[in-house]
Amino acid sequence: MDFTYVPMARGFVYLAAVVDWYSRRVLAWRLSITMEAAFCVEALEEALACHGKPDVFNTDQGSQFTGQDFTGVLLKAGVAISMDGKGAWRDNVFVERLWRSVKYEEIYLRAYDTVGEARTSIGRYLAFYNGRRPHSSLDRKTPDQAYFDRLPQTAAA
């Protein structure tokens, strides 16, 4: 998980995303007008509620991710916490790659006037990213295909 700045016509907002390392699928995301931890906690809670708990959860060492509100959610769920080395962007390369894609294919092409407009447009892009954008690292599969292909199949009764 990580967050990044999103420039707007006037000012900027912050975009946080939880990414599955295996499939590169964005599991949850949030926009915020502040850097407070709450929007990161919300994205984390959504990812855990909708996709279950991973064995390990990785972030950088930002205050949003080291505070009790955030780490408490992971500890309560029994998830091991992993943090990148200071300034070591390569430790979270899959999220950094997402930021490059979302910025160059969506954000930098727009000048959002409102937070609502940014939320709608970024949401549309992330749905495209998960469902229709193939990745060479995934053997030309989309993140959705890679994510759902690895889940165990249940037989119909």
Predicted regions mapped to residue ranges:
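Charged DNA-binding/catalytic regions of mobile-element recombinases
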Residues: 1-157
